[in-house]
């Protein structure tokens, strides 16, 4: 496998820390050792997160091509758009963000706090759009790029989650290589890796990266899209394309993609009672915050799997914390009593 042939522009502090979740592990019976790799602490750029790791492989193309405006898209509380806005500010570029109405959640301040508030502070041109949630290329995003061209700018397209960009999976191939280096220091290997999946490129990169040592199917995706067939198709397609880019040396198959579809409901961006319980439990056992859209759902999935005995006794499970905590502010009503 050859990831190093692809240029990378550092936006992160370096390897993200792995911490044992000792109290949570004990609370759940002590038969499975839980750890977290803190992608939520990976950068000083507006709280960072998993998209910042991905953007490291897109920025060289931005700089080499003379682009002056980053154009991205997400929901109103998108972590992706906040991270794109931060990277644009860091590089001295303009930024246009399309924020679609992906979540059926009514709150008076939903479009004024959290991620979207930070994007505005960072100087992005934030454009609200009424379109609902879907996965793939969006007309509103294409229109935003055309608007930049008409104004004389040169837009660089960054799709939702970086996932439709050809290089969108590379960052999390690097995640897997980083984990292997940390495992060598620890003196053990993780048996499973748990990660939230929606647009697909985070899990796809992990699948490719861990395929290099035979653990592709030990990457357990927890769907948070509530459109799991679309998400599964994206993961598989992106993983296959990424495997070619890094010269993995073998094909990625359907069996390599494991996606647990039990925790994404009731729909994208809306937590269920299990999500909220997982957020509170993780916070109160470990002081580690997760959000109602993504990490709360993947945390719910991991906790439920431990409780149900789905991880063999003695397993070491690595939870990939992808970030997203700023979105908690947009759901304050749900936590008004803690």
UniProtKB/Swiss-Prot annotation:
The gene is acdS. The active site is at residue 78. Its EC number is 3.5.99.7. Belongs to the ACC deaminase/D-cysteine desulfhydrase family. Its cofactor is pyridoxal 5'-phosphate. It comes from Ralstonia nicotianae (strain ATCC BAA-1114 / GMI1000). The lineage of its organism: Bacteria, Pseudomonadati, Pseudomonadota, Betaproteobacteria, Burkholderiales. It is an enzyme of class 3 (hydrolase). One of its GO terms (biological process) is amine catabolic process. PANTHER family: 1-AMINOCYCLOPROPANE-1-CARBOXYLATE DEAMINASE-RELATED. The modification N6-(pyridoxal phosphate)lysine is found at residue 51. Signal peptide: none annotated. One of its GO terms (molecular function) is D-cysteine desulfhydrase activity. This is 1-aminocyclopropane-1-carboxylate deaminase. Catalyzes a cyclopropane ring-opening reaction, the irreversible conversion of 1-aminocyclopropane-1-carboxylate (ACC) to ammonia and alpha-ketobutyrate. Allows growth on ACC as a nitrogen source. InterPro entries: ACCD_DCysDesulf, ACP_carboxylate_deaminase, ACP_carboxylate_deaminase_bac, TrpB-like_PALP, TrpB-like_PALP_sf. Homotrimer. NCBIfam families: ACC_deam (TIGR01274). It catalyses: 1-aminocyclopropane-1-carboxylate + H2O = 2-oxobutanoate + NH4(+). Pfam families: PALP. The keyword Hydrolase applies. Gene3D superfamilies: 3.40.50.1100. Keywords: Hydrolase, Plasmid, Pyridoxal phosphate.
């Amino acid at each position: 496998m050859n990831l190093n042939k692809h240029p990378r522009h550092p936006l992160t502090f370096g390897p993200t820390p792995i911490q044992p979740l000792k109290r949570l592990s004990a609370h759940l019976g002590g038969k499975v050792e839980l750890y977290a790799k803190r992608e939520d602490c990976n950068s000083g750029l507006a709280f960072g997160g998993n998209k910042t790791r991905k953007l490291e492989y897109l920025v060289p193309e931005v700089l080499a091509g003379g682009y002056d405006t980053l154009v991205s898209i997400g929901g109103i509380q998108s972590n992706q758009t906040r991270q794109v806005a931060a990277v644009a500010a860091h590089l001295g570029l303009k930024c246009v963000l399309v924020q679609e109405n992906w979540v059926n959640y009514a709150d008076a301040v939903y479009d004024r706090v959290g991620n979207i508030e930070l994007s505005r502070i960072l100087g992005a041109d934030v454009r609200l759009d009424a379109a609902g949630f879907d996965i793939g290329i969006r007309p509103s995003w294409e229109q935003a790029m055309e608007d930049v061209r008409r104004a004389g700018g040169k837009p660089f397209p960054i799709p939702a989650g970086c996932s439709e960009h050809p290089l969108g999976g590379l960052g999390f191939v690097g995640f897997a290589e980083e984990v292997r280096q940390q495992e060598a220091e620890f003196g053990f290997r993780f048996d499973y890796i748990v990660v939230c999946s929606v647009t697909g490129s985070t899990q796809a990169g992990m699948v490719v990266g861990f395929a290099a040592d035979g653990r592709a199917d030990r990457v357990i995706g927890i769907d948070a899209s509530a459109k799991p067939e679309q998400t599964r198709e994206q993961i598989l397609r992106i993983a296959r394309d990424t495997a070619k880019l890094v010269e993995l040396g073998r094909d990625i198959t359907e069996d390599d993609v494991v996606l647990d579809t039990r925790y994404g409901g009731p729909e994208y961006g809306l937590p269920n009672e299990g999500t909220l319980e997982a957020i509170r439990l993780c916070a109160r056992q470990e002081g580690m915050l997760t959000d109602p859209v993504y990490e709360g759902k993947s945390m719910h999935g991991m906790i439920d799997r431990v409780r149900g005995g789905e991880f063999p006794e003695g397993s070491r499970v690595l939870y990939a914390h992808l970030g997203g905590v700023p979105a908690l502010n947009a759901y304050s009503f749900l936590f008004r009593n803690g």
